[in-house]
């Protein structure tokens, strides 16, 4: 079964993986914030190999309708947004049914995507969406927003630098910024909440689930028109927290690695994702492929890639290359702490030979050349440190 909300003009098919639920109720809303539910439908529990799936087909044109799942276990109920949500309301707590065709900017479906055959010739710059245009010196009409990338002088800045690819720091929906607040806020965004939805604080209207999608696509289109590629920074190694996550609400601890003390924490963020489990693996692959198909992403930078397992990433590469044979894949080949996943299964630098098609950052070269990233009293080669020649 295809998970999430699959839209057609005549009906929408809802499907959720929930191995912990006794019952699941689909709740529909007119708004994505705090309005009362307008309809509820008990979902049908699957049988056999689909015994952990719940599904329901709602008839009528539901484009723009918000929804949530009521998970009932042991006669206790909790509301959750959809892990497979493609759109959502403000702060991501309610998912939204969306006709994605209406979010395409003019010409987006058939846009010309720049070709970059030689990955060794790439010149990549890392940016935060907020940092690009928030300062007054940027003279942007859309400070801190996706739409700032559609302004010619912003794109000219990157072109003049000689950049071939823009690596965008987390731009999916993250939990550390209140999208409903008008006060200035800032966060890098390594706090995943909705993996398949753009961040609302970077849109001009976080309350309308379609706006952030269209403006994200406009950003991608503008970068491509300027002759550059887009690399998306993705954080599949952990969630913002456990108990507020849709993974936990719908699936308990299934999505997380556990140890004797509780949650394994190789991310150093309080939890780590169990990428080796079948439904988690499928989720990560589905998510990556969705961003490439729907948003024309050219590549991915994996945060703490060493927390993820090798097999999942190799399978993801194969699926991604079916969509784009020149897909760009690289990441941090280390963890932020000890993991319950055996080291020989981790996507780390030491296992790079098992991961064809992936590049890895080298913190060793970085520290050797410029000095230790954390300790000022450990200089590097360019600062005159002795004994670095062999390392170089």
Regions found by a protein language model. Give the residues of each.
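Substrate-binding/active-site clefts of carbohydrate-active enzymes
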Residues: 128-152, 156-295, 305, 312-324, ...
């Amino acid at each position: 079964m295809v998970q999430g909300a699959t839209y057609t003009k005549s009906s929408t098919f809802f499907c959720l993986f929930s191995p912990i639920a006794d019952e699941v109720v689909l709740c529909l809303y007119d708004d994505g914030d705090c309005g009362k539910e307008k309809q509820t439908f008990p979902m049908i529990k699957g049988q056999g190999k689909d015994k952990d799936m719940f599904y329901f087909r709602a008839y009528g044109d539901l484009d723009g309708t918000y929804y949530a799942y009521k998970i009932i276990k042991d006669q206790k109920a909790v509301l959750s947004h959809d892990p497979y949500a493609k759109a959502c309301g403000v702060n991501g707590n309610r998912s939204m049914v969306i006709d994605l065709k209406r979010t395409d900017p003019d010409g987006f479906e058939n846009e010309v995507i720049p070709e970059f055959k030689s990955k060794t010739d790439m010149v990549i710059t890392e940016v935060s969406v907020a940092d690009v245009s928030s300062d007054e010196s940027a003279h942007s009409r859309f400070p801190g927003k996706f739409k700032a990338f559609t302004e010619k002088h912003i794109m000219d800045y990157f072109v003049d630098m000689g950049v071939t690819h823009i690596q965008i720091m987390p731009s999916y929906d993250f939990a550390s910024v209140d999208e409903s607040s008008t006060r200035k806020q800032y966060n890098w965004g390594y706090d995943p909440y909705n993996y398949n939805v753009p961040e609302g604080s970077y849109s001009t209207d976080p309350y309308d689930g379609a706006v952030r999608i269209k403006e994200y696509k406009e950003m991608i289109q503008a970068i491509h028109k300027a002759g550059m590629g887009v690399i998306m920074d993705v954080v599949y190694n952990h969630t913002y927290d456990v108990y507020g996550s849709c993974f936990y609400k719908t699936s308990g601890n299934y999505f997380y690695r556990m140890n004797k003390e509780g949650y394994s924490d190789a991310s150093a963020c309080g939890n780590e994702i169990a990428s080796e489990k079948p439904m988690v693996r499928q989720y990560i692959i589905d998510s990556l492929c969705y961003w490439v198909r729907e948003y024309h992403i050219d590549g991915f930078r994996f945060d703490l890639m060493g927390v993820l397992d090798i097999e999942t990433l190799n399978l993801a590469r194969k699926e991604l290359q079916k969509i784009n044979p020149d897909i760009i894949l690289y990441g941090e080949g280390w963890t932020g702490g000890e993991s319950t996943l055996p080291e020989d299964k981790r996507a780390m630098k030491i296992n790079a030979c098992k991961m064809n098609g992936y590049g890895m950052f080298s913190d060793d070269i970085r520290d050797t050349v410029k000095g230790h990233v954390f300790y000022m009293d450990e200089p590097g080669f360019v600062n005159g440190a002795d004994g670095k020649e062999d390392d170089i």
